[in-house]
Amino acid sequence: MAPIKSRRIAVLGSRSVGKSSLTVQYVENHFVESYYPTIENTFSKNIKYKGQEFATEIIDTAGQDEYSILNSKHSIGIHGYVLVYSITSKSSFEMVKIVRDKILNHTGTEWVPIVVVGNKSDLHMQRAVTAEEGKALANEWKCAWTEASARHNENVARAFELIISEIEKQANPSPPGDGKGCVIA
């Protein structure tokens, strides 16, 4: 059996988009009804992906805005990023673009493993960001995308499996011309 691989994942996005709800639902299998702004929490969970065991450290961050400074602990030693927006908030969707730019500037790279997550998919009557907009952004960034509902535990595990997939894509690149591209779930 292959040795366990360690991976650090940062969950970033605007305030009140459900970063903590996604993380707690994934790690502890329950939805937190009340809202308490997060300063920062770190969770651990073992993930099995394609037969490989991953010991993950998931850093649930405070909400970002355009004036937030990306903390170096959110870039140094981080293997991948889960960028979360609320499907009910166009401004939170715009904020993931700013956060990604900050990550790329801070890391000095053109690409990092990212999954973009449109959270609160259960609030479809209040939708402000279409699935097509989310998919288009993921295609532009050559990254993974999914919508999720932390409340109903829909696609929550999928979001974290996708970030492991993106991380492994970087760690074990495919030969050129294999026709593989973005993953949209």
From Swiss-Prot:
Residues 183-185 form a propeptide. GTP binds at S16, G18, K19, S20, S21, V32, Y35, T38, N119, D122, A150. It comes from the Eukaryota. Keywords: Cell membrane, GTP-binding, Hydrolase, Lipoprotein, Magnesium, Membrane, Metal-binding, Methylation, Nucleotide-binding, Prenylation. It is an enzyme of class 3 (hydrolase). Its main location: membrane. SMART domains: RAB, RAS, RHO. It catalyses: GTP + H2O = GDP + phosphate + H(+). InterPro entries: P-loop_NTPase (IPR027417), Small_GTP-bd (IPR005225), Small_GTPase (IPR001806), Small_GTPase_Ras-type (IPR020849). It is a lipid-anchor. One of its GO terms (biological process) is positive regulation of TORC1 signaling. A motif (Effector region) lies at residues 35-43. The modification Cysteine methyl ester is found at C182. Mg(2+) binds at S20, T38. Coiled coil: none annotated. It is found in: Cell membrane. Its EC number is 3.6.5.-. One of its GO terms (molecular function) is metal ion binding. GO terms for cellular component: cytosol; extrinsic component of cytoplasmic side of plasma membrane; nucleus; plasma membrane. Belongs to the small GTPase superfamily. Rheb family. Binds GTP and exhibits intrinsic GTPase activity. Regulates entry into stationary phase when extracellular nitrogen levels are adequate for growth. This is GTP-binding protein rhb1. It comes from Schizosaccharomyces pombe (strain 972 / ATCC 24843) (Fission yeast). The lineage of its organism: Eukaryota, Fungi, Dikarya, Ascomycota, Taphrinomycotina.
